Every structure is written in C-alpha cells, then in structure tokens.
Amino acid sequence: YYPLDEGWPGRASVVHASPDVSFAWDFPYDDYFTYKGGLGGNTDGEPFQYMREIRQHGQDVSLTLTIDPHVTDEHLIAIANDLRPFGRVFLRINHEATGNWFSFNKRCTYQEVADFFVRASRVIKEHAPNVQTIICIGGIEDLSKEEMEKEAEFAQTIPAADIWSVDKYMALHWGWPYDVAEHGGDTHSRGTVADTYEKTKRSFERFRYLNGGTPKPMTMAEFNADGDVTGPYEQADMVREFCDKLEQEQADWFSAFTFYQFRDRGRLGLEIEDPNNSEVGIAQPVLDTYKEIIHRDWFRPQMEKQEGEVQLPVTLRWTNSEDAEGLAMPLHFEKNPTFCEAVFEEDSNLMLELNGRWFYKAPGTKTVDMMAAFFEKPLDGPADMTLKIFAPTATGEN
C-alpha cells in the first residue's frame, strides 16, 4: 500500500518495468499485487475476494500488508474500515522490518519504521477491534547475543502487537530468478533445523522479556526450506525434522507457522508451478510430508463434544477457526461404503468433517460426495462414525 507513489495502484513490475532490474526488490515499491482498498479505494478486488473465500471455508485471514510509513491516520482508518467485516483478521504490518530489502526500509530509518508500526497498530485496532496485529522482525539472529536485532528501535513494537513473529527459512534462495544457487554464491543461504528452532525459541523468550514477562502468541509467519537450495528430498526432510522437534518437546510456547507457500514458481512450494501452464501445479515430496504432519494429533484442531441431543432447529455460531459451535451427527456403517453422499435442500454454506477429512459445501451446491474420506482410511468392518457440521459465513463477511 504505497498510495503516495507515482504509478499507484499498478503493480510495481508493470508500471515500473525496466531491463535494468536484476533483483526482486529493485522496484520503487514492493512488487506484490497492490491493496486496492484504503483511502479512495474499494473492496471489490484483491485481496478482498481471497479474504472472502478464506472465511467461507472456515479459516481466518492472515493479511500481510507493506505500507508506506508516510501515510496519514486517515489512510490507516480507511484500511481499518475495510477489515471490519472480516471477523478475526491477523494483520502483519511491514514484515521483516529489521531487514533492508523492502521499500519501507529504504525510505525510512529503523526508528521511523518501528514508530509507524506502533501508530498503525493503535489506529487500526481502535477502528477495527477484530484485527490482531503481528510484529514480524528478525528477533534473535545471533545465538551469541542476548538482545534481538535492532532492539533499541523495535522494543516498543513488542507490547504494541497482539502476536509476535519471526520469518525463518532453513534454506533460502533470495536471488531467484535472476541467478542459480551454487556453491560459493552469495544470494542464498542454508542453515540447520536445530539452529532455526533455537533462534525462534530464543526470540520468543526475548520478546517475552521485553513485554514484562507476559507471553503472547509466537508464530513464524513464513517458514520453509527452499528446495532451490536443498533439492526436493532434503526440503521435505528438514520440514519434517522441525515439526518433529515441536512435537517431541511439546512446544506450547509456539502457536503457529505459515508454510510459505502452497505453489511457487521457484521451489518453495508444496507444489511448483508447471512452466507450461501457470494454472497447474506439480506436487513436491514436501506436500505428502506436510499432509502427514497436519494430521498428527499434536497439530490437529481440538473439538469438544457436549453430551445429549439438541432439539432442531438450532443456530450454528461461527466466530473464528478456533471458536465455533456445530452439530455432530452419529452414523453407522455396515462396511466400507461404495457411495457416501450428503444431499442438501438449503443454500447453506457448510464445512463438513468425516473420518478426519474436511469437505466444503458452497451455497447452491446440492450434493457433496464424501467418498474421499475413505480412500486413504477405508473401513475394515462395521463402524460408528460422526459427521461434524459447521456453518461459516456464506458471504465471507460478517
């Protein structure tokens, strides 16, 4: 969101296209798709369509927004008003703020960037109390030091934020696509799982200290090992090893990570983009690894079942992905089914869970085929099961 810049709201690589660009961050402002809301904008396009789809599917929006620190409070209030209808929103403002690659760091001092985060966090939450802000900084990057990176400037952001975050890549090729990650190169890095884990934990401990000993949710808003450095097999191995460590240590100080990302033109994705067709992804070994991890008990969402039966009709409440009320319907299967369908008469918007598999029913959809719940976990005889039904917002907005 750089509304004061020439060329706005066009994407930087389009309105500032130049043969002289040799690095992803060489444009006047950050080369992401632009935020079309804000002062004088609207919520018809992106990212708002994405946000509606995410909430229709029962998840919470985690929005990363780079913002020119020179914008006025009026701009921030307009952003807050954009976000008010979207329930719990995690807003990551000017992420990786102790770095030097994003445009906001190139046009402001670290002190100014930190001051802006505190101001933006305060103003946006005043006008949109559903928003939780995320401070994303380097944290502890050198294990021999007690203080975090740029602590003098950014200590104030720790109590101002609702959620703490560090972006950690166990391997990363930031020179992509302009060069190749080869031995001796200076546009990529590779660390270890143990080192990444320890830096993340030490960052949390330092953040807690700077918050007067009171903890807040600790996340990694970006996490992966770049297959462009490691190759696809060791990428999967490193992701598995990190998650094994979280589970083995029962790391309840750690709240979440965002795997970056689902599909990538390089080799960061669970899928890589098919170079012949950008609409198609090619699954990587880490996709199966990630699928196995999120189905472990330690990483699965918890559901509490109330005793007794309810009297229909009932109202299904959806607050966010960790706070909702649904229906549990007992089912008896004589054997592994040949067909398993749910048929609906109403234009409801539902998330359904059966045998550990989630299904989405959009408004207008009449039949949901749930046989996929048994492809990988077939029944070997009679079984009593439970169909769980939740009703997120049908429009994606409150």
Question: Which residue ranges define each predicted feature?
Answer:
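Alpha-helical scaffolding within the catalytic cores
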Residues: Y2-D5, K36-M51, E74-N81, E141-Q156, ...
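Beta-strand-rich ligand-recognition modules
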Residues: H332-F333, D347-N398
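Active-site groove signature of glycoside hydrolases
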Residues: A80-Y110, T133-E141, M220
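Glycoside hydrolase catalytic-domain groove-lining segments
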Residues: Y32, G41-T43, Y169-D228
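Aromatic-rich peripheral "rim/lid" segments of glycoside hydrolase catalytic domains that contact
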Residues: E249, W253, T258-F339, M351
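N-terminal carbohydrate-binding/catalytic regions of secreted carbohydrate-active enzymes
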Residues: Y1-P85
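Active-site clefts of carbohydrate-active enzymes
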Residues: L63-L65, F102, L172, W176, ...
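Aromatic-lined carbohydrate-recognition surfaces of secreted/lumenal glycan-active proteins
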Residues: R122-E149, G213-D228, F254-D264
